[in-house]
């Protein structure tokens, strides 16, 4: 299988819409967006519903892989501990939602994690769709419900024995799915070429610098600075950053704003400008992981907002800007020592 996932797509993860499953536990909607670097309007989306125990298992698997990468640039995110009492409180549910989202977003700039077989398996069962072509109403499941079962099903909801209470969260149901075109489409979004190499490397001990450099563009970041070419690019970025602070995103600038009856620029442009401006500063300061996340978040907001923008000229300008910063993010992977 080719490395299409790493080379052709940027990723954006969200965890949202917690709801109560009919069996009594809380589950969360997990959305993975794969944005084509060649065409920012080409977006593939995978949606799955997961519970706390699924996130906890993924956290353990990815933490193990991360430890064996010997990365010194960032700390692997912590994850909320399991608890029996209070797990249905709003604050606990929100803490778990945020912890799960932080975990998924942490994997984005690390190829060994974002193309891992564990992450691909986590999204197994989700259908690959194109949000721009499919009505979202068809993808939204019914709202949270706690149904009242008919009398003949009452026995299914009997309370667990005392010795089993508290263990329900820690159990991960196994539900193998047969191969299908939908799963083949999912496989194409996750590159697992180096699965066998990674497994053998973990078994024989720490990875060498040369091995890390094959799939980790930040492996030498702590010991070496940016290349001369990249230093020159960052000088230009500083000028671009100052311009972003002063100019709107519209291709026609102030004249276009006046031509549109003085209406203020849409809110999504301001949000994206703030994120991408900070990303430019982070890149200049050498905080490449933070810069990459900032580019992705900013482009995500642009692509979400531009679809409803009433101005054709502004839509065209925003699409060009999104493409520019997708390329900027790609350079963080390909141009660093």
UniProtKB/Swiss-Prot annotation:
This is Sorting nexin-15. Residues 141-151 have a biased composition (Pro residues). GO terms for biological process: protein transport. Transmembrane segments: none annotated. Residues 1-130 form the PX domain. GO terms for molecular function: phosphatidylinositol binding. Homodimer. Interacts with SNX1, SNX2 and SNX4. It comes from the Eukaryota. Residues 133-156, 244-270 are annotated as: Disordered. Its main location: cytoplasm. It comes from Mus musculus. Keywords: Cytoplasm, Cytoplasmic vesicle, Lipid-binding, Membrane, Methylation, Phosphoprotein, Protein transport, Transport. SMART domains: MIT (SM00745), PX (SM00312). It is a peripheral membrane protein. The modification Omega-N-methylarginine is found at residue 105. It is found in: Cytoplasm; Membrane; Cytoplasmic vesicle membrane. The modification Phosphoserine is found at residues 201, 227. InterPro entries: Intracell_Sig-Traffick_Protein, MIT_dom, MIT_dom_sf, PX_dom, PX_dom_sf. Residues 253-263 have a biased composition (Acidic residues). Residues 265-337 form the MIT domain. GO terms for cellular component: cytoplasmic vesicle membrane; cytosol; nucleolus; plasma membrane. The lineage of its organism: Eukaryota, Metazoa, Chordata, Craniata, Vertebrata. PANTHER family: RIBOSOMAL PROTEIN S6 KINASE, SORTING NEXIN-15.
